[in-house]
Protein backbone atom coordinates (compact mmCIF):
# COMPACT_ATOMS: atom_id res chain seq x y z
CA UNK A 1 0.00 0.00 0.00
CA UNK A 2 2.93 2.36 0.58
CA UNK A 3 1.34 3.70 3.76
CA UNK A 4 3.95 5.04 6.16
CA UNK A 5 4.92 8.16 8.06
CA UNK A 6 3.58 11.05 5.97
CA UNK A 7 6.86 12.96 6.26
CA UNK A 8 8.57 10.17 4.29
CA UNK A 9 6.12 10.37 1.38
CA UNK A 10 6.22 12.76 -1.55
CA UNK A 11 3.27 15.20 -1.65
CA UNK A 12 1.74 13.49 -4.70
CA UNK A 13 1.94 10.07 -3.01
CA UNK A 14 0.32 11.46 0.15
CA UNK A 15 -2.48 12.99 -1.89
CA UNK A 16 -3.01 9.74 -3.80
CA UNK A 17 -3.37 7.85 -0.51
CA UNK A 18 -6.18 10.05 0.87
CA UNK A 19 -9.11 8.26 -0.78
CA UNK A 20 -7.85 4.71 -0.16
CA UNK A 21 -7.15 5.64 3.48
CA UNK A 22 -10.63 7.13 3.93
CA UNK A 23 -12.18 3.99 2.44
CA UNK A 24 -10.13 1.77 4.75
CA UNK A 25 -10.95 3.66 7.97
CA UNK A 26 -14.32 3.41 9.71
CA UNK A 27 -14.18 7.16 10.30
CA UNK A 28 -11.61 9.90 10.65
CA UNK A 29 -11.43 13.52 11.69
CA UNK A 30 -8.65 16.05 11.41
CA UNK A 31 -8.94 18.97 13.81
CA UNK A 32 -6.83 22.05 14.36
CA UNK A 33 -5.63 24.56 16.91
CA UNK A 34 -4.89 28.08 15.70
CA UNK A 35 -1.54 29.81 16.13
CA UNK A 36 -3.12 32.04 18.80
CA UNK A 37 -4.36 28.93 20.66
CA UNK A 38 -0.84 27.47 20.56
CA UNK A 39 0.40 30.77 22.00
CA UNK A 40 -2.32 30.79 24.67
CA UNK A 41 -2.22 27.13 25.78
CA UNK A 42 1.23 26.00 24.69
CA UNK A 43 1.80 23.24 22.16
CA UNK A 44 0.67 20.45 24.48
CA UNK A 45 -2.54 22.24 25.45
CA UNK A 46 -3.22 23.02 21.79
CA UNK A 47 -2.69 19.37 20.86
CA UNK A 48 -5.18 18.39 23.55
CA UNK A 49 -7.70 20.97 22.35
CA UNK A 50 -7.41 19.78 18.74
CA UNK A 51 -7.62 16.15 19.89
CA UNK A 52 -10.88 16.78 21.71
CA UNK A 53 -12.23 18.75 18.74
CA UNK A 54 -11.63 15.66 16.60
CA UNK A 55 -13.17 13.31 19.18
CA UNK A 56 -16.23 15.55 19.51
CA UNK A 57 -16.79 15.51 15.74
CA UNK A 58 -16.49 11.72 15.69
CA UNK A 59 -18.95 11.48 18.60
CA UNK A 60 -21.45 13.68 16.77
CA UNK A 61 -21.38 11.09 13.98
CA UNK A 62 -21.91 8.30 16.50
CA UNK A 63 -18.34 7.04 16.51
CA UNK A 64 -16.48 6.54 19.78
CA UNK A 65 -13.03 4.95 19.49
CA UNK A 66 -12.35 1.84 21.59
CA UNK A 67 -8.73 2.89 21.98
CA UNK A 68 -6.50 5.81 21.07
CA UNK A 69 -2.85 5.64 19.99
CA UNK A 70 -0.76 8.80 20.35
CA UNK A 71 2.47 9.11 18.41
CA UNK A 72 5.13 9.93 20.98
CA UNK A 73 5.89 9.28 24.62
CA UNK A 74 3.57 11.80 26.31
CA UNK A 75 -0.13 11.41 26.92
CA UNK A 76 -1.22 14.95 26.11
CA UNK A 77 -4.83 13.88 25.60
CA UNK A 78 -5.70 12.52 29.06
CA UNK A 79 -3.66 14.83 31.29
CA UNK A 80 -6.35 17.46 31.87
CA UNK A 81 -4.87 19.17 34.88
CA UNK A 82 -1.42 19.64 33.39
CA UNK A 83 -1.93 21.59 30.21
CA UNK A 84 -5.29 23.22 29.66
CA UNK A 85 -7.73 24.70 32.10
CA UNK A 86 -10.93 22.69 32.29
CA UNK A 87 -12.62 25.99 33.09
CA UNK A 88 -12.25 26.85 29.43
CA UNK A 89 -15.83 26.68 28.14
CA UNK A 90 -15.01 25.19 24.74
CA UNK A 91 -12.86 22.46 26.28
CA UNK A 92 -15.58 21.54 28.78
CA UNK A 93 -18.14 21.35 25.96
CA UNK A 94 -15.84 19.23 23.80
CA UNK A 95 -15.18 16.82 26.66
CA UNK A 96 -18.92 16.50 27.33
CA UNK A 97 -19.68 15.81 23.65
CA UNK A 98 -16.80 13.33 23.35
CA UNK A 99 -17.96 11.26 26.30
CA UNK A 100 -15.72 8.96 28.29
CA UNK A 101 -12.20 8.90 26.91
CA UNK A 102 -11.04 5.56 25.52
CA UNK A 103 -7.80 4.06 26.84
CA UNK A 104 -4.81 5.95 25.47
CA UNK A 105 -1.58 4.23 24.41
CA UNK A 106 1.57 6.16 23.60
CA UNK A 107 3.94 4.76 20.99
CA UNK A 108 7.13 6.50 19.89
CA UNK A 109 7.32 6.73 16.09
CA UNK A 110 3.88 5.14 15.80
CA UNK A 111 3.43 6.71 12.37
CA UNK A 112 6.29 4.51 11.13
CA UNK A 113 5.07 1.23 12.65
CA UNK A 114 1.27 1.41 13.05
CA UNK A 115 -0.89 1.56 9.91
CA UNK A 116 -3.79 3.45 11.49
CA UNK A 117 -1.43 6.13 12.87
CA UNK A 118 0.33 6.37 9.50
CA UNK A 119 -3.10 6.79 7.88
CA UNK A 120 -3.98 9.58 10.31
CA UNK A 121 -0.60 11.16 9.63
CA UNK A 122 -1.28 11.20 5.89
CA UNK A 123 -4.76 12.71 6.28
CA UNK A 124 -3.53 15.38 8.69
CA UNK A 125 -0.50 16.33 6.59
CA UNK A 126 -2.50 16.60 3.36
CA UNK A 127 -5.14 18.75 5.05
CA UNK A 128 -2.58 20.99 6.76
CA UNK A 129 -0.58 21.47 3.57
CA UNK A 130 -3.79 22.33 1.70
CA UNK A 131 -4.78 24.89 4.34
CA UNK A 132 -1.33 26.47 4.27
CA UNK A 133 -1.30 26.69 0.46
CA UNK A 134 -4.73 28.38 0.49
CA UNK A 135 -3.72 31.17 2.89
CA UNK A 136 -3.55 34.72 1.53
CA UNK A 137 0.12 35.20 0.81
CA UNK A 138 1.77 38.62 0.79
CA UNK A 139 5.15 36.96 0.23
CA UNK A 140 5.68 34.19 2.80
CA UNK A 141 5.57 31.39 0.22
CA UNK A 142 2.97 29.31 2.11
CA UNK A 143 2.24 27.13 -0.94
CA UNK A 144 5.86 26.01 -1.23
CA UNK A 145 7.07 25.96 2.39
CA UNK A 146 3.79 25.07 4.18
CA UNK A 147 4.86 27.27 7.08
CA UNK A 148 8.13 25.50 7.78
CA UNK A 149 11.33 27.51 8.23
CA UNK A 150 12.63 27.23 4.68
CA UNK A 151 15.24 29.88 3.79
CA UNK A 152 12.78 31.90 1.67
CA UNK A 153 10.22 31.82 4.48
CA UNK A 154 12.81 33.07 6.99
CA UNK A 155 13.73 35.86 4.57
CA UNK A 156 10.05 36.78 4.19
CA UNK A 157 9.64 37.01 7.97
CA UNK A 158 12.74 39.23 8.09
CA UNK A 159 11.15 41.48 5.45
CA UNK A 160 7.44 41.34 6.33
CA UNK A 161 7.44 40.44 10.02
CA UNK A 162 5.10 37.86 11.52
CA UNK A 163 1.54 37.38 10.32
CA UNK A 164 -1.54 36.17 12.18
CA UNK A 165 -0.64 32.71 10.88
CA UNK A 166 2.64 32.63 12.81
CA UNK A 167 2.94 31.48 16.41
CA UNK A 168 4.09 34.50 18.38
CA UNK A 169 5.31 32.54 21.41
CA UNK A 170 7.91 30.70 19.33
CA UNK A 171 11.21 32.12 18.17
CA UNK A 172 10.56 32.83 14.51
CA UNK A 173 13.70 32.74 12.37
CA UNK A 174 14.01 36.12 10.68
CA UNK A 175 11.83 38.04 13.14
CA UNK A 176 14.83 39.51 14.98
CA UNK A 177 16.12 40.92 11.67
CA UNK A 178 12.68 42.42 10.95
CA UNK A 179 12.56 44.08 14.38
CA UNK A 180 16.11 45.39 13.93
CA UNK A 181 15.17 46.88 10.54
CA UNK A 182 12.15 48.60 12.12
CA UNK A 183 14.24 49.94 14.99
CA UNK A 184 16.84 51.40 12.64
CA UNK A 185 14.28 52.75 10.16
CA UNK A 186 15.42 50.53 7.28
CA UNK A 187 12.90 49.59 4.59
Regions found by a protein language model. Give the residues of each.
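RNase H-like, Mg2+-dependent phosphodiesterase core
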Residues: 1-187
